[in-house]
Design a protein with these regions (language model features):
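Preference for long, amphipathic alpha-helical scaffolds in soluble/luminal domains
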Residues: 1-269
Length: 269
């Protein structure tokens, strides 16, 4: 799988398309490569990461509407996590990603890209990856401000019991009750649990329903599999085309699910 994700890499570290091209750009390939455990010193991965930083860390004017910066923070979050896992946390451009996330964080703890004038609630989709990125940055550098910001986002997820409206108690999106792989930037309960686990909050009582849901997703053969909407496809052209075939990803999802089960052992309701 790792070889397939690195196939077609150019001498400059790119893959012949924009880094954010879905899903063959370097940005997305790197997220998957890091999830698969590619060694931090891998030269090909680091070269690809430099092309991502050249793009994402370029100066740009913040888009602020009614005092709230509107940002696709999943971009910075994923890039930040990848670079930290590849041993690049001390790169000044990586610090720039942290500064952008800290600056753009909304009062409720998350981020949002929507331009609606009345938008006041963060997007779970845009807030998931920043948790990962900020936690990885803290692990690499000890930066406490990054960890504090990630914890505020974790509280946002927990306040919604991982997938419910804090106002009505209803499920926000039925798709969030499924496991997706790769999930790219999309939120679901499984990746939400992985995020709060990074923060040491997996045993919080507000995550109890999501933990129980994870148990119910275990199949008779002892595996967990992708069951939700498939965000990728194979092909030669167009958006949403992947470099590899993931199938139901049970060999990747199962160990991740088992890690969550072990970490939550003894948690109450």
């Amino acid at each position: 799988m790792i070889a397939g994700l690195l196939q077609g890499q150019h001498a400059d570290g790119s893959f012949g398309v924009h880094p954010y091209s879905k899903w063959k750009g370097a940005h997305w390939r790197l997220v998957s490569l890091v999830e698969l455990g590619i060694p931090r010193a891998n030269r090909a991965a680091r070269a690809a990461a430099r092309t991502v930083l050249d793009w994402i860390a370029a100066s740009s004017e913040p888009r602020v509407i009614r005092g709230l910066e509107r940002r696709h923070a999943s971009m910075e979050g994923n890039a930040l996590a990848v670079c930290c896992r590849l041993g690049m946390a001390r790169d000044r451009r990586v610090r720039h990603l942290v500064d952008v996330l800290l600056r753009a964080q909304w009062p409720d703890g998350g981020w949002n890209c929507r331009s609606d004038l009345d938008a006041r609630h963060s997007s779970f989709h845009e807030s998931l990856a920043p948790i990962w990125g900020l936690v990885e940055y803290h692990r690499a550098t000890g930066d406490r401000e990054a960890l504090a910001a990630a914890r505020r986002t974790g509280e946002l997820l927990l306040e919604h019991r991982m997938f419910r409206s804090s106002r009505t108690g209803k499920v926000i999106d039925p798709e969030w009750l499924h496991i997706h792989w790769p999930h790219y930037w999309h939120y679901d309960f499984f990746h939400g649990l992985r995020a709060v686990a990074m923060l040491g909050l997996l045993k919080d009582s507000r995550a109890a329903e999501a933990r129980e849901l994870l148990h119910t997703k275990r199949r008779p053969d002892g595996t967990w599999r992708a069951s939700g909407r498939r965000y990728w496809r194979r092909g030669n052209a167009g958006t949403g085309v992947e470099a590899v075939t993931w199938g139901d990803a049970h060999k990747i999802i199962t160990p991740a699910a088992e890690t969550l089960i072990r970490a939550s052992a003894g948690a109450g309701t």
